[in-house]
Amino acid sequence: MRQENKPCQQFYFVLDEKALQSPLRENPSKNVRTIPDAGDENSSFGHARVIA
């Protein structure tokens, strides 16, 4: 479980940088889509809500 959490955090940071570059208001669905693709649908989905 710990190993799965580590990659999730890395993806979260990468998405955070992309989110800063691309305005969420312009393409909100794009960022939300990229997060689930990162790995865990449940954990990623939760993070997606935080970013949105």
UniProtKB/Swiss-Prot annotation:
Residues 24-52 are annotated as: Disordered. It comes from the Bacteria. This is Uncharacterized protein TP_0039.
